[in-house]
Amino acid sequence: MSDASANGDATEGAAPAAAQLPKMQILGQFIRDLSFENAAVQYGTATQGQPDIQVQVALDARKRTVDNQYDVIMKLKIESKTKDEDAPKSIFLIELEYGGVFLIENIAEQQLHPFLMIECPRMLFPFVRRIISDMTRDGGYPPLNLDQIDFVALYRQQIAARQAQQPVGTA
């Protein structure tokens, strides 16, 4: 009998602590926009040697009308060009907007924006990497396996750029 009451007390004491733990759940994922332009095939661009590949990443997060739900969108622009110094020619261009719908609970308001812009993209990235890899392979190229993205550094760059755009000396 004493064991039951001890367990009951422990359970009651643990419930408020468990309720305060941060919670993230992916409710859904989707491709908003996808484009693969295979210029090498269209225009006969030679693809000899290692191409120059540029990857641009942008992130966006918006609150949905439902409580604690957010859309997080990862936008990638990947351009592959020949390494011809005189006039580099496009080999392929990929543009992808990939999104996730997230349920976020028990995150402090001041931590919510970094959480949405760092942790949520980390969850989406493996799926984005696979889409890019499959698309380049299906386009007739070796699969392009994107390197891991440092979302913390990307977030810091976005904050610094936003602060640089603000007028100096405003009070």
From Swiss-Prot:
Assigned keywords, A-Z: Chaperone, Cytoplasm, Protein transport, Translocation, Transport
Transport found in the keyword field: yes
GO molecular function, one term: unfolded protein binding
Pfam families in alphabetical order: SecB
Localisation: Cytoplasm
BP GO annotations: protein folding; protein tetramerization; protein transport
Coarse class of the protein's main subcellular location: cytoplasm
Listed InterPro entries: SecB, SecB-like_sf
Disulfide-bond pairs as recorded: none
Cross-referenced SUPFAM superfamilies: SecB-like
CC terms in the record's Gene Ontology section: cytoplasm
Entry keyword Mitochondrion: no
Family: Belongs to the SecB family.
Role of this protein: One of the proteins required for the normal export of preproteins out of the cell cytoplasm. It is a molecular chaperone that binds to a subset of precursor proteins, maintaining them in a translocation-competent state. It also specifically binds to its receptor SecA.
Listed NCBIfam families: PRK05751.1-3, secB
Subunit structure: Homotetramer, a dimer of dimers. One homotetramer interacts with 1 SecA dimer.
Full protein name: Protein-export protein SecB
